[in-house]
Amino acid sequence: MVDATAIFYEGLDSAVIGLSEDKGTFRVCYRVHLCYEALMNDGMSYKDAVEWFEYNIYNSYVGESTPIFVI
């Protein structure tokens, strides 16, 4: 059962590759290039997708449940 505190980013479901669990804390695992693809499918250019992702998602810390990004 996934903890309700696991953070799923809206619009990036296609980039989820799994879950991580450590001492009862669940973290969603995303594949970075699939995040770019999801953003480009929403109309962004590759450059804009990379910049937006890195600024708004990749470099953010939102607590113990901060998602993991696999390169």
What are the residue ranges of the model-derived segments?
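C-terminal alpha-helical interaction appendages
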Residues: M1-I71
